[in-house]
Amino acid sequence: MNVESILARKGTEVATIAPEASIKKAADWLRAKNVGALVVMSNDALVGIISERDIVRAFSRYGEPVASMQVKEIMTQGLITASLGDDLTHLMRLMTRHRVRHMPVLRNGKLAGIISIGDVVKHRLDDLELEANVLRDVYIASHPRH
């Protein structure tokens, strides 16, 4: 299974926000979209990502004034990205190595979707369930009851 097949199942909609938006707006948008991260876009270019974790860290560091700060002040830059052809094992290694929970997916340098660690786990579990069902069916077929 690869990134493209995961996106085909989950969809390619990505919640985005501008770098000049307030952290309050980002938090509201995260809640409204029920997502854990927003991709930060400027003039159709991927410039960063802001996650719930980024907001919690900023709140811990700066206190209440963080709500009026801009997304670009606390977003993660220098992103690790995935490509549509990346396989699930490669993706899991990247996410683990770089300790990220959300990874933008690019197609020809343009944003094509986003994959979360939850998406990876769900699809891995689906694969394992299918494999277990196939093995069970093979066993049952090869061991008829008398």
Model-inferred region functions:
Residues 16-34, 81-99, 106:
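The conserved cystathionine-beta-synthase
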Residues 1-47:
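A positional/architectural concept
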Residues 21-32, 61-74, 109:
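Short, charge-rich amphipathic segments
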